[in-house]
C-alpha cells in the first residue's frame, strides 16, 4: 500500500523530528511519501486568489490526474476510529492513496471540487505544517487501530 501526501511549502526545522518519527513508524504499515511543492507566491506582493491558483497548479502537476483526498477545514470530521475505517475502505478500493493539504492560505476551489473525499482534522485552524504532523500521527494511529495494536507504550 502506498500513501502519498502533497503539501505546499516546506517543513520547519523544529517540526522535522516529529515528521521523521511518524514517517518511520508509518513505513511499517505502508510506503509513505510526502512531497512538498512550491508555494504560490508572496502574500506581501500578491493577492490571495493568485497565490491559491498557483499552488493549485503545483499540486495538480504532482497529482497527474490521480484521485485524491483533501484535508480541508470544511471536510467531514471523523473520530480516530472512523478515520481508520475510512482508510481501510479506501485501501480496499485504491492501490495508492493520495492526500492533499492546502498551503498557508488554504486550498483553491478547483481542487476542493475535484476531491474524492474531504476530511477535516479539526474545526480549529492549524498551520499547514502542523497539519502534516497531525495527519501522519492520525494515520499511524489508524493503522494501529486496524491491526488491533495498542497505541500507547
From Swiss-Prot:
Supply the EC number(s). 2.1.1.177
Repeat: present as a keyword of the record?
Answer: no
Q: Name one GO molecular function term.
A: rRNA (pseudouridine-N3-)-methyltransferase activity
Which catalytic reaction applies to this protein? pseudouridine(1915) in 23S rRNA + S-adenosyl-L-methionine = N(3)-methylpseudouridine(1915) in 23S rRNA + S-adenosyl-L-homocysteine + H(+)
Q: InterPro entries, alphabetically?
A: Alpha/beta_knot_MTases (IPR029028), RlmH-like (IPR003742), tRNA_m1G_MTases_N (IPR029026)
Which family, according to the similarity comment? Belongs to the RNA methyltransferase RlmH family.
Q: What does this protein do?
A: Specifically methylates the pseudouridine at position 1915 (m3Psi1915) in 23S rRNA.
Its recorded name reads Ribosomal RNA large subunit methyltransferase H
Its lineage reads: Bacteria, Thermotogati, Thermotogota, Thermotogae, Thermotogales
Q: Source gene? A: rlmH
